[in-house]
C-alpha cells in the first residue's frame, strides 16, 4: 500500500514515510492510493480485538513486518483499557452505544493514540532514522491528553500540544496541565481550535520553524496524520462482529453508524471500513450548533464564514474540518486539481461548493443532523433517567442525530452510536443537565455527579485533583510560530 497527497497524487510515499511526515509538504493529507482489498468478515468473526487490529493494519502498512505490527498492537492495547476491552457495546433503546472511552484518558482518541507512538517508532526503524521526532498537536480537548499519554518519555520523541485557552472543559484542561513526561510541553492559545489547528499546519511548512528543526523530524499526532486514522477503522469492524456473534444481526446485514463529528476523522474511518467491505448503509454525521458539516452534507456547500459558537460539546466546536479533504479526494477519484481548487477557495474566501455529481456520491454514504444546546441537555437527561445510562455531551449529540435520522428516514437498519468520552470529562455540564444545579469546582461536581448517578469515576480522572499543575503558558496566536520555533531550538540543543 502506497500513500498519495490529496493535493498532488503524483507524490507517492510508503506508509512509514506518511506516518513520519504527518502532513505532505504541499499541505495535502496522505491518503491510501487504493482501497481494493477487502476484510474477510467470516475470518474477522474468529478474531479478538488485537487480532482484528493486526489484520486490518496489515492491509495498510505494507512496509511493516508482521512482527512489527503485532508488537505495536500488543504494546498499545494489552492492559491499557478497562477489562481489556477496547470498545464494549451497550444496548439502549435506539440501538447500541460503542463505548470508546475506557482507555487511559477516558476518550476515544486513546484507541489511536496509544498505538501511534509505536507505529511512529517502527516507521523510524524502517526508514533507518535516528533523529529526534518532534510532534506538534492541536487539540480541542481530548487529543492533547491522549497524545501526551502516548508519547510521554518515548525515546527520541518530544511532543508539544496547543489548546484553546477558552473552550475546553475544566477537566480536559487539568488533564493536560498536570501531564507527566520530560519530553512534554503544553501551551494555551488565545483563540479557538481552528486557530490551533491552522498553527500546526502552518508550522509544518514555515521556513523559520523548519530551520529550527534542521536535524529533527517534524510530525503531528492530529488526524491529519494517517497513522492516527487507520487504528480507528478497527472498532467499526469489531462492533459489527460483536453483533453478529450475539445474534442481533446476521453476517452480511447492513448497519448504520452515528458519529459525533468535528474534524471528520472518526467518521472517515467508518467510510474506510465500508470501502474494506463492512456492510454499512449510512454514516450519520452528528454536529452541534457549529453545523457547518450538516449544511455541507445536505447541500454540497461548505461555508466557514460564520460565528464560532462555544458549546458544551467543545471537541466538535470546529469550523474548518480537515479530514473532509481526504473524503472529497476519494470520492472524486483522486482529482487533486479539484481538491486544490476547493482548499484554495476555503483558505481565501472561507467557502466552496462541490459539483452535483460529487454531492450525490457524498450522500450515498453520508447523511447529517445537528443538535442545539437544549436538545443536547435533554438527551443527557432522558438517557440517564429513562435508561440509567450516563453519556457525555458529544455522545448526546450523536444520540439525538440517531433519533432524528430514524424519524426522518423510517430506516429500521440497526444503528451503532459512537460514544466518544466519559461523562466525567464534562462533569459540570452533565450534572447541570441532569439536575439543573451548577457547581463551580470541577472536582466537587465530579463527586456530586457520582453521588447522583452511582456511576464509577474513571481512575485517571479521580486522581487529577492531587496532581501538581506543570504547564501554565498562555500565548497570543500571532506569537505561536515563534514560540514553536524556540521550543524546537531548545529541543535540538538538548538532544545534541
Question: Where do the model's predicted regions map?
Answer:
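PLP-dependent amino-acid enzyme catalytic core
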Residues: 1-496
Amino acid at each position: 500500500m502506497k500513500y498519495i497527497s490529496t493535493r498532488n497524487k503524483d507524490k507517492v510515499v510508503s506508509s512509514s514515510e506518511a506516518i513520519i511526515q504527518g502532513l505532505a509538504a504541499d499541505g495535502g493529507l496522505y491518503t491510501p492510493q487504493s482501497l481494493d482489498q477487502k476484510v474477510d468478515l467470516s475470518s474477522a468473526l474468529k478474531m479478538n480485538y488485537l487480532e482484528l487490529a493486526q489484520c486490518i493494519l496489515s492491509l495498510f502498512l505494507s512496509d511493516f513486518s508482521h512482527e512489527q505490527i503485532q508488537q505495536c498492537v500488543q504494546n498499545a492495547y494489552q492492559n491499557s483499557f478497562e477489562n481489556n476491552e477496547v470498545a464494549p457495546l451497550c444496548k439502549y433503546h435506539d440501538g447500541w452505544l460503542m463505548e470508546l472511552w475506557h482507555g487511559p484518558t477516558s476518550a476515544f482518541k486513546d484507541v489511536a493514540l496509544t498505538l501511534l507512538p509505536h507505529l511512529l517508532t517502527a516507521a523510524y526503524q524502517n526508514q533507518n532514522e535516528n533523529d529526534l521526532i518532534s510532534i506538534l498537536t492541536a487539540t480541542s480537548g481530548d487529543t492533547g491528553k491522549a497524545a501526551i499519554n502516548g508519547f510521554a518519555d518515548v525515546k527520541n520523541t518530544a511532543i508539544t500540544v496547543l489548546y484553546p485557552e477558552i473552550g475546553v472543559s475544566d477537566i480536559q484542561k487539568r488533564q493536560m496541565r498536570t501531564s507527566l513526561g520530560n519530553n512534554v510541553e503544553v501551551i494555551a492559545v488565545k483563540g479557538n481550535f481552528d486557530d490551533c489547528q491552522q498553527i500546526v499546519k502552518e508550522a509544518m511548512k514555515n521556513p523559520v520553524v523548519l530551520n529550527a528543526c534542521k536535524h529533527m523530524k517534524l510530525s503531528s499526532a492530529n488526524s491529519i496524520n494517517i497513522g492516527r486514522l487507520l487504528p480507528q477503522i478497527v472498532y467499526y469492524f469489531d462492533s459489527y462482529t460483536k453483533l453478529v456473534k450475539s445474534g442481533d444481526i446476521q453476517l452480511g446485514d447492513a448497519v448504520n453508524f452515528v458519529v459525533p463529528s468535528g474534524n471528520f476523522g472518526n467518521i472517515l474511518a467508518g467510510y474506510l471500513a465500508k470501502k474494506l467491505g463492512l456492510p454499512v448503509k449510512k454514516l450519520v454525521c452528528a454536529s452541534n450548533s457549529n453545523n457547518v458539516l450538516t449544511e455541507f452534507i445536505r447541500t454540497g456547500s461548505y461555508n466557514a464564514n460564520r460565528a464560532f459558537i462555544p458549546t458544551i460539546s467543545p471537541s466538535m466546536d470546529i469550523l474548518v474540518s480537515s479530514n473532509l479533504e481526504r473524503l472529497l479526494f476519494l470520492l472524486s477519484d483522486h482529482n487533486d486539481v479539484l481538491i486544490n481548487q476547493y482548499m484554495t477557495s476555503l483558505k481565501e474566501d472561507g467557502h466552496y461548493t462541490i459539483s452535483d455529481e460529487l454531492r450525490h456520491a457524498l450522500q450515498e454514504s453520508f447523511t447529517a443532523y445537528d443538535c442545539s444546546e437544549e436538545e443536547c441537555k435533554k438527551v443527557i437527561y432522558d438517557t440517564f433517567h429513562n435508561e440509567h445510562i450516563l453519556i457525555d455531551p458529544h455522545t448526546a449529540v450523536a444520540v439525538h442525530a440517531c433519533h432524528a435520522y430514524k424519524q426522518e428516514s423510517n430506516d429500521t437498519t440497526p444503528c451503532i452510536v459512537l460514544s466518544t468520552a466519559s461523562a466525567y470529562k464534562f462533569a459540570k455540564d452533565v450534572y447541570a443537565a441532569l439536575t439543573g444545579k451548577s457547581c463551580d469546582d470541577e472536582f466537587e461536581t465530579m463527586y456530586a455527579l457520582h453521588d447522583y448517578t452511582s456511576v464509577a469515576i474513571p481512575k485517571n480522572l479521580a486522581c487529577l485533583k492531587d496532581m501538581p499543575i506543570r504547564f501554565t503558558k498562555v500565548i497570543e496566536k500571532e506569537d505561536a510560530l515563534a514560540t514553536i520555533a524556540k521550543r524546537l531550538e531548545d529541543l535540538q540543543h538538548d538532544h545534541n
